[in-house]
């Protein structure tokens, strides 16, 4: 997967990678510029990007990490032929069906993310018994894990991860304007601790 990600980045060996979660954020020109300045920008599920004149989360997207429950936004499949789409499917280990929604582009060419190589190692790092029980990380943390493990020497920029500051929430708002409960399969407090620990290493920056 590393070579595939690198093929979509601005340079073969990205020096900076941004992973943008879907927490609603206030306008911040410096944040938006920092995201768009990265060699590789990864967004998640039903994401949004800045419209002309906005300065919130930037406008560039190289990679989309998503799941079958993705919510439609105007940006999800915009310019999809120019992006890499990584389909995470941890639920396939338990109850999730193989079918994909009919509204996805027929020629999307999404690449499945390996449960064995990606999902389970992350679950181990989080202390989640995913092999035996239907519990796994959010798609956002999976995207961050993919970025960190694929490019361990790159500067990682994280933003839009509400559970780092609010690990006890039971529902959350999305930047696209919708909201939902935190799925019972997720343990967001553990995810928040993991991502927060990365910010102490000097090579990961959290932009609030």
Predicted regions and their residues:
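Metal-ion/cofactor- or nucleotide/acyl-coenzyme-handling active-site neighborhoods
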Residues: 1-208
């Amino acid at each position: 997967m590393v070579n595939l990600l690198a093929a979509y980045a601005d340079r073969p060996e990205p020096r900076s990678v941004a992973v943008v979660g879907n927490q609603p954020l206030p306008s911040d020109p410096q944040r938006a510029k920092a995201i768009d300045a990265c060699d590789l920008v990864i967004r998640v599920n039903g994401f949004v990007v800045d419209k002309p004149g906005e300065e919130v989360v930037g406008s560039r997207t190289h990679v989309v990490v998503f799941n079958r429950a993705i919510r439609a936004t105007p940006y999800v499949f915009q310019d999809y032929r120019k992006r890499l789409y990584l389909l995470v499917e941890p639920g396939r280990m338990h109850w999730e069906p193989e079918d994909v929604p009919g509204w996805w582009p027929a020629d999307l060419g999404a690449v499945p993310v390996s449960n064995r190589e990606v999902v389970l190692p992350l679950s181990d790092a989080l202390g989640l018994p995913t092999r035996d029980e239907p519990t796994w990380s959010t798609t956002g943390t999976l995207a961050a894990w993919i970025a960190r493990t694929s490019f361990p020497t790159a500067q990682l920029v994280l933003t839009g991860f509400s559970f780092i500051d609010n690990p006890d929430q039971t529902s959350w708002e999305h930047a696209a304007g919708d909201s939902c409960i935190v799925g019972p399969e997720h343990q967001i407090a553990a995810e928040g601790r993991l991502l927060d620990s990365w910010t102490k290493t000097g090579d990961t920056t959290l932009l609030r």
